[in-house]
Design a protein with these regions (language model features):
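Tandem repeat scaffolds
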Residues: 1-86
Length: 86
């Protein structure tokens, strides 16, 4: 999924272990309950993505835009969240 455009995709409950989402457009993607173990989200656009209850163990987010994304614990990432949910 390198550089893929998955804008508003419903990926709920999917298994994406070790998947490469580098530089992908995942704006408003729904990853609720997904298995994303060791997934690579480097430089991905994850604005308003939903990671509620997703497993992100070992996943990489360097340079990823997480503005207003919903994190695994349900909190919203603040504006300016690049590389990590703040």
């Amino acid at each position: 999924f390198f550089r893929a455009n998955l804008y508003e995709s419903n990926l709920q409950g999917a298994n994406f272990e070790k998947t490469n989402f580098t530089s992908a457009n995942l704006t408003r993607a729904n990853f609720t309950g997904a298995s994303l173990i060791e997934a690579n989200f480097q430089n991905a656009n994850l604005v308003e993505a939903n990671f509620t209850s997703a497993n992100l163990t070992g996943s990489r987010f360097e340079g990823a835009n997480l503005n207003n994304a919903k994190w695994t614990d349900g909190r919203l990432c603040e504006a300016g969240s690049i590389g990590e949910c703040k």
